[in-house]
Design a protein with these regions (language model features):
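Nucleotide-activated chemistry modules centered on ATP-dependent adenylation/adenylyltransferase
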Residues: 1-169
Length: 169
């Protein structure tokens, strides 16, 4: 939880947690959003890749690593798909990321595969999907698809498509 997710994402997460009876531990930065902004400014507004790297390190990568370390996790799974970005198209089903195995069971799934899986398992769509978003992240760096941009191209103003969680960079 970066502290910057849209309200719809928090509501959606709670709905899934309740409907599926999930036990979830929310991981967050040790630095509150307000403190981070006071120290570094709104890193997503500068249009500098280095500032986005700092933002991702503080809000995403470090909290995930702390959580994985806390529970001594040696392998974790993610829902990345090869069709999402050029970088993800080069990924393997199992890889080592920051000294841990990263399992990508959905790597070759298509949008159609996702749709039918969700239908067959009565999983609700993210509410922003109905509003034209095909990729949802933080409120300040996600936007609905349009004629020229869609998917992860809408993220971070088109400057970056990856936050660093799924890469060794």
């Amino acid at each position: 939880d970066t502290g910057y997710l849209p309200p719809e994402t928090y509501h959606y997460a709670e709905k899934l947690i309740d409907n599926l009876s999930l036990e979830v531990e929310v991981l967050q930065s040790e630095l509150s959003p307000a403190r981070m902004e006071a120290k570094y400014g709104k890193l997503w507004e500068t249009n500098k890749e280095s500032d986005l790297d700092k933002y991702h390190e503080l809000r995403k990568i470090r909290p995930l690593e702390i959580g994985l370390e806390k529970y001594n996790i040696s392998c974790w799974a993610s829902g990345v798909r090869s069709s999402q970005t050029e970088n993800r198209n080069k990924m393997k089903f199992l890889d080592i990321i920051r000294k841990r195995f990263s399992l990508r069971p959905l790597l070759n799934w298509t949008n159609k595969d996702i749709f039918y899986y969700m239908e067959e398992n009565n999983l609700p769509a993210h509410p922003l999907f109905i509003k034209g978003y095909s990729s949802v992240g933080d409120w300040h760096s996600s936007s609905p698809d349009d004629i020229e941009t869609k998917g992860r191209d809408t993220r971070f103003g088109g400057i970056k498509q990856e936050c660093g969680i799924h890469t060794n960079n």
